[in-house]
Amino acid sequence: HISQSLNFDLAILEKYKDRCKNLKYIIIPIDYFSMYSTLENGIENWRVKNYSIYYDISTYGNYWSGFEIFNGKLPSNISRVKSYLLNRKSDVTCNKFGFGTNYNSKDSKDLMETGKTASKRHTIKLENNQTTFSKNIQTINSIIEFANSHNLKIIFITCPAYSTYRENLNPIQLENSVNIIKKLSSKNTNTAYYNFLTDKSFIAEDYYDAD
């Protein structure tokens, strides 16, 4: 899901562990911002309600996460309700296989502008987020333990991004994130890590936005 953080990756695995008899691989994205953020503490924390409402996953006493109407911007929610009631326009933006349908490179945004804005949005004040970094390491270790106990393999990936995004990243934040996942992967035989951030096989036409 968009903006899904590591703690919800783990929560979904634990919730559906008995329904995944044929599962062999778990793919976990570890991107520039992943180790220093959680969904609850980010600018898109309104998405937490999706896990409470549609997955019945605990959101740690957040009463308001049980309501669509009280999350996000009220005018947007009213517009969504009107669109459905008047035009039967669904707000579901994925296909039956779970793949998102909202973003298509044919309708791409300005790669120069989105590279700058996204990199700024994803850059964290490191000194204020060491606790989150440590908690996310614990979460990854829990995911690895889950995979071990269910005889699963984990593939960690860093997704490709356009040059205008990469050029504006904090090198320390990026290095910390890449190094920790390399370290955790090297210590566990059921894991692999692939870094596609600078992969040159992806060209401008492949991107919807720079990140």
Regions found by a protein language model. Give the residues of each.
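Conserved SGNH/GDSL esterase-like catalytic core that processes O-acyl groups on lipids
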Residues: 1-54
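C-terminal regions of proteins
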Residues: 172, 176-211
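Active-site segments of SGNH/GDSL-like serine hydrolases
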Residues: 144-169
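Short catalytic/ligand-binding loop motif for oxyanion handling, primarily in non-cytosolic enzymes
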Residues: 34-38, 163-166, 203-204
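Active-site-proximal beta-strand/loop segments in catalytic clefts of secreted hydrolases
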Residues: 2, 29-31, 157-160, 196-199
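Loop/turn elements at helix/coil->beta-strand transitions in domains of secreted/extracellular proteins
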Residues: 21-25, 148-155, 188-192
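Secreted/periplasmic serine-hydrolase-like ester/acetyl group-modifying domain
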Residues: 30, 39, 43-150
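Soluble non-cytosolic domains of exported or imported proteins
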Residues: 3-7, 130-137, 175
